[in-house]
Amino acid sequence: MNSIVIGSGFGGIAAALRLKAKGHQVKLIEKHPDLGGRARVFKKNGFIFDGGPTVITAPYLINELFELFKKDPKNYIELSPLKIWYQFIFEDKSKFNYSGDEANMVKQIEDISKDDVEGYQKLVSFTKKIFDKGFTELADVPFDKPFVMMQQLPALLKLKSYKSVYSLVSSFIKNEKLRRMLSMHPLLVGGNPFTTTSIYGLILYLEKKWGIHYSMGGTGNIIKGLEKLMLEEGID
């Protein structure tokens, strides 16, 4: 079977490789001279800049594309786990090193607001419930019929999907610094924490499950590695 994939972002490349792994002859069409979509790079004054995403939160999804062809991802890309995920600098010049070290997270939260430690732990537990539903259960479900989505409404309402991420966080956290910090995740996907549905709170737990990784040499190097794989496997 012949298949055409339009667009060479991560989604297009992944679709092309998965189709190829199922035995399709695949042609990938891209309007730009280089691949990557939002993950394209641009060069200026001798420097290379990632044009889009830099945070890798579910590295297994990328590794899986190489493993489909029994290839070792380490021969194509290098993903390095980060110890400090984000550093927040507030108006008063105080800093918060956000990481996967829960003991250190609790200590820093305690330094800012002792009363919010329990709320933080409850927030993490609640975002796990969102993650279990929105990612583990539904990430691979095609919502191609209205009824399929309607079936999920009771569960989504129970998870307070009608709230914004900021509103959800605020129901657990009282300190404004911590509220802003813990509700920032929609920014990673171009969303507004004050208007984006709280379902995106699952990112908070997703990070804790797999950590945050950085592609050595930039996100563009992942695209290079995937391009090499596509050429090896005969994708045009």
Language-model-derived ranges and their functions:
Residues 31-32, 197-201:
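Active-site-adjacent bridging/hinge elements
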Residues 53, 194, 213-217:
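Alpha-helix capping and helix-loop boundary segments enriched in small/acidic/polar residues
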Residues 1-129:
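N-terminal glycine-rich phosphate/pyrophosphate-binding loop and immediately adjacent elements
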Residues 63, 167, 224:
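Active-site phosphate/pyrophosphate- and oxyanion-stabilizing loops and adjacent acidic/basic residues
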Residues 202-236:
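Helical element adjacent to the flavin cofactor pocket in flavoenzyme catalytic cores
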Residues 13, 99, 159, 163, ...:
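Conserved structured core elements
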Residues 2, 169, 226:
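Conserved hydrophobic/aromatic pocket- or pore-lining residues that grip, position, or stack substrates
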Residues 91-196:
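Rossmann-like flavin
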